[in-house]
A protein has these predicted regions:
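Juxtamembrane/disordered regions of integral membrane proteins
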Residues: 1-135
Length: 135
């Protein structure tokens, strides 16, 4: 039976949220590149950590990245209320740009999960490695 692994989603989402933080107050191109790179890595790491359903874990990691980002923004607002630096906005730029960036992040995470699925194959029940027919 396959199940969702919260640890895989959490780690992938945490890594992907770094891209959201890096691109928060930057231009559109910088934000898109940061999101694409971080979400690909986050999706890959979620896929590596998951035993099955790797692309699904990668997609959920992309959603978790926005949840982590929301928490970071709330803490940033609390810090700015206490006299710290200004906090990043949750939706930087125009709504259309934000939606496109979110879609780019989801696609990049799925690509990362797909790479993990292609590179990792489950072991056989007797714990011996399969011979690769390509070698």
């Amino acid at each position: 039976m396959t199940r969702l692994e919260g640890m895989a989603v959490g780690w992938g989402g945490l890594i992907a949220s770094i891209g959201l933080l890096i691109g928060a107050e930057r231009g559109d191109l910088t934000r898109a590149v940061a999101v694409a790179v971080a979400f690909t890595i986050g999706g890959f790491l979620a896929g590596v950590r998951a035993e099955s359903l790797r692309p699904l874990h990668a997609a959920l990691a992309a959603v978790a990245a926005y949840a982590f980002h929301a928490v970071f923004v709330v803490f940033g607002h609390l810090a700015s209320l206490l006299g710290g630096p200004a906090s990043p906005s949750f939706v930087p730029g125009e709504t259309r740009t934000w939606v496109l960036t979110a879609f780019l992040g989801l696609v990049a995470a799925m690509i990362g999960g797909g790479i993990a699925m292609a590179w990792l194959r489950p072991q056989r029940a007797d714990h011996r490695r399969r011979r690769d027919s390509r070698t």
